[in-house]
Swiss-Prot record:
PANTHER family xrefs: RIBOSOMAL PROTEIN L25/GLN-TRNA SYNTHETASE, ANTI-CODON-BINDING DOMAIN-CONTAINING PROTEIN, RIBOSOMAL PROTEIN L25_GLN-TRNA SYNTHETASE, ANTI-CODON-BINDING DOMAIN-CONTAINING PROTEIN
Record's protein name: Large ribosomal subunit protein bL25
Transmembrane parts of this sequence: none
Domain of life where this protein originates: Bacteria
Keyword Ribonucleoprotein on entry: yes
Function of the molecule: This is one of the proteins that binds to the 5S RNA in the ribosome where it forms part of the central protuberance.
Positions of region (Disordered): 177-196
Protein keywords: Ribonucleoprotein, Ribosomal protein, RNA-binding, rRNA-binding
MF GO annotations: 5S rRNA binding; structural constituent of ribosome
InterPro entries according to UniProt: Rbsml_bL25/Gln-tRNA_synth_N, Ribosomal_bL25/Gln-tRNA_synth, Ribosomal_bL25_b-dom, Ribosomal_bL25_C, Ribosomal_bL25_long, Ribosomal_L25_dom, Ribosomal_uL5_bac-type
Family: Belongs to the bacterial ribosomal protein bL25 family. CTC subfamily.
GO biological processes: translation
Annotated gene: rplY
Length: 196
């Protein structure tokens, strides 16, 4: 997993401060670690957007103006429901030997049988919650869809984790992750015959 540097500035929590920051392209954030006091910071919205909307997960070195660096990952991101802009982020610190839970993006490999028949791949979960040591965390979890046919679904319990040493998926086993939807014409015909 790649490590990315991200500049942060300490901030004082005051009334209306967050709205003022956001207006200037700055996102309020907090840094926390078990048993330690939460630290309020701010981060550049453009730099944060690149990380949040990346197809891979990252370890993040939070760099303060005084030269101090803290190793972390993004634990939570809040979006504005109207504009979809990031309005707040939580960074979690960790030790190298500490088991953590991270959101890791899903990637697809293979040419699906269902797609060759005209179906469409639907990614129902774009990220999975993975538990393990930070050093073992992958950039993404790759799911082979070669044998996935029309109407079939891959659930969390069906994702092989053999290639990912010491890692576990923490999402519910029955959670659907990927499916193949029939072509639009077929789906409309099924709806009409069910209604008829």
């Amino acid at each position: 997993m790649e490590t990315i540097a991200l500049g942060v500035e300490p901030r004082v929590i005051r009334k209306k401060e967050a709205a003022k920051l956001r207006k200037n392209g700055i996102v309020p954030a907090v840094i926390y670690h078990k048993g330690e006091e939460t630290v309020a910071v701010s981060v550049n919205e453009i730099a944060l957007n690149k990380l949040v909307h990346s197809a891979e997960s990252h370890i993040i070195d939070l760099q303060f103006p005084d030269g101090k660096t803290l190793r972390s990952f993004i634990k939570d991101v809040q979006f504005d429901p109207v504009s979809d802009r990031i309005i707040h982020t939580d960074f979690q610190l960790f030790a190298a030997d500490e088991v953590v839970e991270m959101e890791v993006p899903v990637a697809i490999s293979g040419d699906s049988i269902g797609v060759e028949k005209g179906g469409k791949i639907l990614i129902l979960r774009h990220a999975l919650t993975i538990q393990g040591l930070p050093a073992n965390m992958p950039d993404h979890v790759t799911i082979d869809v070669t044998n996935l046919d029309m109407g079939h679904i891959i659930h969390v319990r069906e994702i092989p984790m053999d290639a990912y040493t010491g890692l576990s998926i923490m999402d519910e086993p029955e959670t659907p992750v990927i499916s193949i939807a029939p072509p639009k014409k077929d789906a409309e015909a099924e709806t009409e015959s069910a209604a008829g």
